[in-house]
Amino acid sequence: SHISDHMLTTIHDPYGWLTQESLYDITMTSAINALKHGTTTVENSTILPDTAYEAMDTSGIRGILAPQMASSFRLDSDPLNWKQALEKTKSCIEHYHNPKRRMSVAVHIHDLWDCMEKLMDGALELAEQYDTRFVTHFWEFQNAVERADEMWRDDGGAFSHYMKRGLITSRSVLFHGSMLREPEIEAIAGTGASIIHNPDINGTNCGNCAYVPYMLKNGINVGLGSDYGSLDAMSAMKLMLIVHNIMPRAERVLPYQAPFYAATMGSARAYGLDQEIGSIEPGKKADIITIDLKKAPH
């Protein structure tokens, strides 16, 4: 997939049309959809974060708010420059970050290909200052990786460049990772960073699939996401189990427990919430939804 196509079809025009009212409605509908399909905690990477927080808080869902920051494009609906975006994220952390209650706030740069390195560095410093997660889309599109490798050829390629800059750490949560090769997966395993697998979108939007069996073999913590609020974790678990049985790679097949673990403890660990949620045991939050399996569409 080409970045220009992605920008025009899923980010620039659609995001630019959003109003506070429509974003509130989308956020609320997404939360209801998540609850309907058994999900009690959602991470929301979003523009207009104050509006998104209001909807998430009203819905009653446990949430991780991740105000979106980028520097290579500006939106009519959220026209912040990169310095203002950092200040907005800081404000959200100071006003909304309260994991013991229900809401966490993560520091979110949209992707490495649409953020200046000043913004990347400032975002990581902010995450370290407030001891919260640093999250980003990562190695999702072939076209983006090829362009980045060309840009940082003298530094050993893009992955080597970003590793040297210290952007991948134990507080990093990397969305997708679907273009990561074996040596890069091994390097990430040594940092303690987590990867969030999104099998639906990898297949439909990117035409690829993260090498999850190799990630797990190397000890990377893998969480599971649906990427879009209109999708659901149940379908993502099913797809995660199926797709890795048929990918033509040396490491194939996942244990049947792996998708469930990724959707629960894997995701909780990724966001530093595994002492509070992710499993049913004494002392943890009782985030429980019951589902009638006779009626469930999954």
Regions found by a protein language model. Give the residues of each.
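Alpha-helical scaffold segments that flank or form the walls of functional sites
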Residues: 2-61, 85-99
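A structural motif
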Residues: 39, 61, 131, 192-193
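Short catalytic-loop micro-motif centered on adjacent basic/acidic residues
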Residues: 40-44, 106-109, 173-175, 196-198, ...
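Active-site glycine- and acidic-residue-rich loops that bind
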Residues: 43-46, 106-122, 203-206, 270-272
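Metal-coordinating catalytic core of metallo-dependent amide/deamination hydrolases
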Residues: 51-178, 183
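Short, acidic/turn-prone active-site loops that include or flank metal/cofactor-
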Residues: 67-72, 140, 199-204, 227-229
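His/Asp/Glu-enriched, well-ordered alpha-helical/loop segment
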Residues: 164-171, 211-295
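A conserved active-site cap/scaffold subdomain adjacent to cofactor or substrate pockets
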Residues: 180-183, 189-221
